[in-house]
Amino acid sequence: HQVATGEIVNCDVDIAGINDLYLQTVRSFYEMGGEKVFDADKIVMFFDHYAPCATITQAENHKQFRKFCFEQGIEKLMDIDQGVCHQVLADKGWVHPGEIVVVTDSHTTTHGAFGAFGTGVGATDLATIMITGKLWFMVPEIFRINLVGKLQPGVLAKDIILHIIGDLGADYGVYKAVEFAGPVVNGLSISERMCMCNMSTEMGCKTSYIQPDAVTME
């Protein structure tokens, strides 16, 4: 259904991801009365920050995560040899246009490259999703950046987004959604689009979006 800027909506979450910095998510799950996750197939655990572990505490955290996954029947445990969370989600083909992707990582905006709503949250919000399958959001203001012209040799997607952030500032997009569009964006590969969307959080954006096209579907 249609929504308006500033409206509060309670949404079903398609992918809930937790990285190994956030063992508190598991603790919060039980502190909030959680017994069984809403849908084990929609929850993904990533060991990508402490990989490999540098301390006993980090190793113990991984042990607790593995135990939780076993008890809850969560099969999507991306252990220390699987890769970085957002790249794994892309490589596995788990993100699709129109889906809501929530991960305990600020760069979850990456998944706007696939036409999905991707945003980062903290431990309590993610625990809420694990219990209910839902999370509330305030519909953000949207601004669009149209990129036209032709890139000079050696200019990459990272250069584009860093230039945009430099022009607009680190707080320009706070609780806003950015749409990247125009001929330049249309000519970018999916990896380049992921780079653009990933870095949008560095100007404060709640989420990012690129209209799905043939590149997305491929």
Segment roles from a protein language model:
Residues H1-E218:
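Fe-S-dependent hydro-lyases/dehydratases of central metabolism
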